[in-house]
Amino acid sequence: ANDRYDAQMSYQRFNFRTNVDINLTKSTVLGMNVSTQFTVKNSPAAGLDALLTQTMTMTPTAIPLKYTDGTLASIKGTPNPYNLLNERGYSNTSSNVAQSTVSLTQDFSDFVTEGLTARVAFSFDATNVNTLNRSILPKTYRAIGRDDDGNIQYEVIDDYAGYITLDTSHSGTRYINFEGSVNYERQFAYAHRVSAMVLYSMRSLSHTHPGSYIAAFPYKSMGVAARATYSYKDRYFFEFNMGYNGSENFAPGHRFGFFPAVAVGYMISNEPWWEPVSDVINLLKFKASYGSVGNDQIGGSRRFAYNTTINTSATGAAWGTVPNSSATGYQTVGGITTSEMGNSEVEWEQATKSNVGIELGLFNDLTIQADLFRDYRDGIFLMRQSTPS
């Protein structure tokens, strides 16, 4: 251990959470959810990867932890794991996460129609991470023998000044989400069960310490989703879903995509005439679905793939000279090149999915499920690696 600073591994976390529901009226509920998490982590500055690597590669008997007079031991090309753990400084990371949601739910059963509700919700999440790395490169030695008086003689391995350096990093995110939905669920004549939902959502994610000018732009998306279901005596099932989603990653005219899906099911084991065999086969259901989903995260680390990016510091061809203070008095000027070619026609990557399946329950104890599915993807965005001749 080092008496100048604390490099020991430690982790502390503090949590706070509260959920409050307030009945504003008999049919109106205001909900507030707030949670906070604060963590502090301390560790050696060298990092776990370096420590484990050197521990596995160094011969245990090559050098001691320290020499008897307290001198730090090491050998050329292979740092002493003891020094990495105790003598290279420390890293301290503190982070906090705050999450909050406010919602308002209204039940319209008494004055519009039974089973109709609406809900709006707003949430704000914030994260902050601050890291302090205080590193030091100590002087290390290797014993090469003893003098006539029995004192250890050393050769210098690392002749560093031993000063502590400071390196800091900061990161954080801000996430805003708004949702508004209308829901309807009702059963008629003990046989017909219907439900419907329409949901609008809008999201925005921003970084407090963006690493590039592209990352400084908030990540935004919005969309509308809808679902309708129907079942008859819990035997016949039908469901329709759709999403109409918008993404910032595409050019105007291509930002929104429509993705529908439909599913049907038949619970044959709920038929009255199935009762004689229900002790053996208690569940038998056939189901099928067909629909599409979209993916807008198609550019990897690249955003706004519809825009062409320009490099103003291209090397290679010289396009002129300008005066400078060198001996020649001039320096060449590079040109402008295209870094990434934009594609204004790029749009949602779409996956068309189809599925048929069966669910089987035996003896009220064993359930078997089998599915056959097909997934076909279209509109996959690829970067051309070479230009055809």
What are these language model-derived features?
Residues 10-14, 256-259:
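Short, conserved loop/turn and helix-capping segments at secondary-structure boundaries
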Residues 19-38, 42-48, 53-57, 73-135, ...:
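Extracellular/periplasmic, surface-exposed regions of secreted and cell-surface proteins
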Residues 67-69:
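Amphipathic helix-loop-helix modules that constitute alpha-helical solenoid scaffolds
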